Amino acid sequence: MKISHLKVNGVEAPLGYRFEHLTFSWRLKGQLEESVECRVEVSKAETFSEILWSGTTKSSFNIISTDSNFLEPKTKYYWRVCFSNLEAVSTFETSKMNEPWKAKWISYKGETKESISFSKKFSFSKEVKQARLYTVAHGLYEVAINEVKLGEEYLSPGYHSYDLLQQYQTYDVTECLIEDTEVSFVVGNGWYRGRFLFEGGFENIYGNKQKLIAELHVEFTDGTLEQFYSDETWIVETNYIQGNSIYDGEIIDYHSEISTLTTEVIDVTTSLLTPRLDLPVVVVEELYPRVFFDTKNQMILDFGQEITGWIFTKLLEDKKSVRFQFGELLQNGAFYTENLRTAKQEFVIKNAKKGVKVRPHFTYFGFRYVRVEGLTQDEAVLVVAQALQSKMDETFEFSSSNDKLNRLLSNIRWSQKDNFLSIPTDCPQRDERMGWTGDLTVFSNTACYNMETRAFFAHFMENLKLEQSLLDGATPFFAPVPKVDDAKNPFLSNAGAAVWGDAATFIPYNLYRHFRDKGLLKQYLRLMTDWVDWIYRQDEARGGNRLWDFGWQLGDWLALDSGIKGSVFGATDSALIASAYYYISADYTSKMLSVLEDNRSEFYRTLAKEVRNKIIHTYFNGDELNTNPVTLQSEVENIRQSMAQNYGGVTIPTAIDTQTGLAVLLRHGLYPNEVARDKLVKRLQEKMDEHNGYLTTGFAGTGDLPHALLDSGLREEAINLLLKKETPSWLFEVEMGATTTWERWDSILPNGEISGTDMNSLNHYAYGAVEDFIIEKLIGIQLPNVLDDTETYLIQPNFTKRLEWVKGALQTANGELSVSWRLSGDDVLVDIVIPGRTIAKYVSTNGDEIYLNPGHNKMKDVIV
């Protein structure tokens, strides 16, 4: 038996994080019965001579939460998990917490577009026992001591709503301090003052000057303490980074004149300063290029995989100018960037000496290809691509006999990695890169399968919660929300639309399903209640009809069923989609309140029931689907048609019995009886047949469609849908050479041409939501029901002769659970590994239920 992956709030040995609650989690490897209890203890002493808190798991999940009110500032804590004669120990350390800041915000007089350096020299005559640096900048920053960069993270402090919170970082600098020490910062524009937002963007969104605040706390071996603060004595200078922008890239000129600026103490509040929630952005992988010349005779680096990150190289000769431009694709054999819109995505180096190691600092790129000027081919082959993402464990592995399916799963994972950088972005390359909520609503379940997302999503939910507080509970289309005056853009002037807004319920719900973290759920439960309450208040103001047939809706975004080429609007009735999500969000909220034994759950349970009943009353006549309901002439539909006219000059057809409409009704049980269900299934079969088994769904329907097909008995239709290779399909993208998932089903046409440039990313994760179907239905790993006291994992694979074998391994809340199956004549050989302290049962093809023991379980099944 082995204990591993000890984490506090989803982070291993967190230093200086915000601890509004404490959740201790771990994994077990080995055969241990679920009835064995695990004990967790917390102490200030490494010997655990005094126990500050202890608790025992009351479930079969390896996780336990408690309040954090016993924590003290700037204190290292030891914690251990133990049972029988086995234990494992880890640590966590608090930040300044609520201690007042003695440091001052510092900046400079005048104006500059350049990057800025802040520095201060210190002398230490005594031996240092322990030292911590607490700091943050307005703008992205890197910090060095004696010219050595601190830590492995980049793009600090990440992206958050600067007007609502400002997260500071804590560094252990004990080993860095010598007798004469210089602490230096380089601060760029970043999201704080650099160009950001679509349609050309805005500058100086949060401020027009970089700023810094820093405190160095030193404890010496003689027991004395000293603290050093940012103030007017710090030196402020320009540096070699002449230009930097999230969208446009970075320019470094080593001949640029370094100017000393006048240091200025700025009267800025420290009330928004809070310990970090954001995970560090780190290099997770390095890739090496194939060098070739395109049809325009331009030198191109092909890294074979689309990534988010930058390049790194060491110059072999003096260079007057080297230019790198980053793009996603080739067109007609040539480098192509038109789909980036206004984003330049360039890295330029000027007047560099031989031996200089170069990389960007305050930007990142979405790319597979790099156009290079100023290097020889021998020099270009030494360029390394470094993939950046927020630091998270990957938690799912997949393999099968179908290489195309394997590539699809890889593409989904890469799109998640590429877009999980500080916040969950829509895309990493064009002039957008924003935290769109709708993408995450449909993808959050898959995201939690692929990675340990608790801390990452906690940071995003904090931003979402703060933005929601400004909107009376409505959820914005993206978070953070840049506060700019742009009445032309409807996404900035509106909030509270179905699917997008439902990120407020889907993210907390899916986090709890996967990780059973009650502390995290308590912290962000208000996201759920505030969002549903907001919908409820709008509903009540219109008479309490329990239909969401009002307001501004996007419907089934990017669906193909309108028949209008290039349109972003699908044909499914927006009121049907919105009302279904009204029901789902109320239901999820009720369930999470029940988990926390909160008696408010009954209100939301009743609300969900009322919404469901109204949906059935509106969209069914007896057991027949009503294809001409009153909602087709509703406020929401009129607004949607107006949007279609304003943003495309088209009229959108509207229907109920689309693939999306039918899939949503079926998957979420929104029908009056089994006869009605059977008729929905028949109609869905007809809709699939109309399109030769291909999908026509958009954001709202794609995740539900394969589940609805299989759960309705259309098993082969569901699996055939997954494995189709022509457009529109998931594997068509693979056939076209994709290494990430696309924003549109037709981002690239069968002839290899890009379908358009206005809104066409090759690195969007939303349609990767199909992965949860692969895990839950094809492999057959189904998480315990959130309200099921038996806490039982259900293993129920769906075999198909189109695949010889399939294997999936999931790092659950308890440890690795793997399922593999292989066809063997008329039999299927099934191999299942269950982690310790885990209850699981297998459901065979003929319906037999078999409880599984921790460890290996082998059995035979049959295929139908």
Regions found by a protein language model. Give the residues of each.
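Extracellular/oxidizing-compartment recognition motifs
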Residues: 1-76, 80-430, 438, 455-458, ...
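Alpha-helix capping and helix-loop boundary segments enriched in small/acidic/polar residues
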Residues: 110-113, 132, 158-162, 172-174, ...
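Alpha-helical support elements that line or immediately flank enzyme active sites
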Residues: 134, 310-316, 321-326, 362, ...
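Active-site acid/base region of carbohydrate-active enzymes
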Residues: 140, 233-238, 380-411, 424-442, ...
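Helix-terminus loop motifs that line ligand-binding clefts
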Residues: 152-157, 161-163, 332-342, 454-564, ...
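C-terminal capping/lid segments that line or modulate ligand- or cofactor-binding pockets
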Residues: 183, 252-253, 431-432, 447-450, ...
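Non-catalytic C-terminal accessory modules of carbohydrate-active enzymes
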Residues: 202-206, 213-215, 224-256, 265-267, ...
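Heptad-repeat amphipathic alpha-helical coiled-coil interaction surface used
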Residues: 512, 583, 589-590, 608
